[in-house]
Amino acid sequence: PGQEPEQPSSTVKTLTNAEICAAMTSSDFSYVEYTIESASGVWTVNASQSKENTFLQCRGKKGGYIKTPEFDKDIKSVTIHFTSAKPVYSDNTYCVFPSTWVVPTADAEYPEDGNVGKAVTDGSYSLTIPVDAGNKQVYVSIISKYSYYLDHIDVAF
């Protein structure tokens, strides 16, 4: 009697560094759209596919993004883990967009309009972005024109 009901534990799906590295097959650094097979599902990215990379190299312009698989539960947050091979800068805004988002293709900063979650880097090597309810698949991107380098990504439900 008087015990609190047990809270359901959160579930996390990960795009691992090993899965990212296995998708790095190109001999150049050009940015292209491709898929990454993962135990958590198929991720779609517009990023460099250079086999020189041991991380996911993305950019916040000209169509750059990471798109999660479509999950069967609402996403509560996305945590991006930056590679220790590159510096992480403070004050860069990252947004999560719904699956209906139209990815900008211009060579300019992305607008934040229509985001379902955002967070700003503080220089640490991970950033958790809370996601509004009702999203089972999302895009993740930096708002500035900078490139960013990810070791792995966690999606929590």
Positions of predicted regions on the chain:
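Short beta-strands within extracellular/lumenal beta-sheet-rich domains
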Residues: K51-I75, D122-L127, L150
